[in-house]
């Protein structure tokens, strides 16, 4: 017998469905459900008197015969490929299926089997995203990893050895011995980790040995000398061993100008860090490289978005991070040359146009490791307020939302050759997922799933009679401990290191997998962020133009996802 529910009652019971709109946190961004994979009247839901019971929504089918390990019911997926309502089945730590869950003996169109071996996680009224990927990590302290995963990051790529002066300034894990020790340390964390070697060398031998040791890429940094010769050598080695190169270019233009650096690229794929330039790079016009087809450009979060405080805080941060002396006039001039309101304002707009493809942190080296996701959505909000809806976003902000979520999920995964494992909510990938209450979206995840197991979660007083009494905050869960963290996380290495059995020699307990497919990439591979405008920068005024149009915007005086959510 049919039963009719109001749209509001349905959303409150099973979550939003096609046509419903959801506000993201306290921003001016709204997303609209595009498709619903569940079946009206045949939804599954767990609880007393609910559907997932034996003989109803739960079948007697064993896990060995096809039932999943975990089902997330009625969640709203937000990913670069769509905004859809679905059940999500997880099996053996991977996403098994996005579709309709239930008991195939009594329900139609079931492609996710719930059985006696299936755990249930209520996704009704929740937003599900892929775990974030931060590709600009200075591994200065291990506590960064706790902060990152608590914010929704599940993969970290960068370099360092701890609070050494070199690591404070550059994202490099230099040399085999340091690489081995960091790979061994990676076993201690419920986080996918990959390390970049130092790429600054005019001869290849010192670069090759780092790749053999496990480096998944090489980092060129001006503090080690990013000259045209080192750029060419580094990219040549990367091409041979299929690893990515990340670059922080020559702020002082000592070894050449931006045109010389572009020439040294020789149309080879490269990930340009903080491409606007406040984080470092040819002053004042490094931003030009985002119009090059072989350049995969990212921002770091100190300049995201442009606010009334952005310029003031940058000078002190820069002096500390790059070991500069405020008593030396040349050091102060070096710092001031990198901080330009005009290029930072243009960066906002270039993100909105899809010309900048990624956002990362620059952790403790001017950036905040726990704010990649917040800063991304604050930028999106600011652009919605200042520039209006994107073409095609009439009733909701779906295109803009998909463009911005791609900046910290699929695009960094593609760039660093790990998209076959992580970076999106798609079948076959590691189940690194974040569940968000819409009111807290992008700010504080409700649950972080790592390799199919809950690793971190909002949790109340452990001595309380129920899980919810205050103080409720992010805490590590069972997936973060002992063998579980090793079974649910990956360590990324080079194919050359796998062939030399480096993980076995080091006794690594995590699964080690190789990066691949990094050298033939172009900007066109960046999902929803593949624009190639012709960029011009006035050397006197620093004004930025894209295809002849002046790019400028006002700094924000207030932002969402800020004080409303935090006491400190």
Curated annotation (Swiss-Prot):
It catalyses: urea + 2 H2O + H(+) = hydrogencarbonate + 2 NH4(+). Its cofactor is Ni cation. Ni(2+) 1 binds at residues 136, 138, 219, 362. GO terms for biological process: urea catabolic process. It comes from the Bacteria. The active site is at residue 322. The modification N6-carboxylysine is found at residue 219. Carboxylation allows a single lysine to coordinate two nickel ions. Its EC number is 3.5.1.5. It holds the Pfam family Amidohydro_1. GO terms for molecular function: nickel cation binding; urease activity. It is an enzyme of class 3 (hydrolase). Ni(2+) 2 binds at residues 219, 248, 274. Binds 2 nickel ions per subunit. InterPro entries: Amidohydro-rel, Metal-dep_hydrolase_composite, Metal_Hydrolase, Urease_alpha_N_dom, Urease_alpha_subunit, Urease_AS, Urease_asu, Urease_asu_c. Keywords: Cytoplasm, Hydrolase, Metal-binding, Nickel. Residues 131-568 form the Urease domain. It is found in: Cytoplasm. NCBIfam families: PRK13206.1, PRK13207.1, urease_alph. Belongs to the metallo-dependent hydrolases superfamily. Urease alpha subunit family. This is Urease subunit alpha.
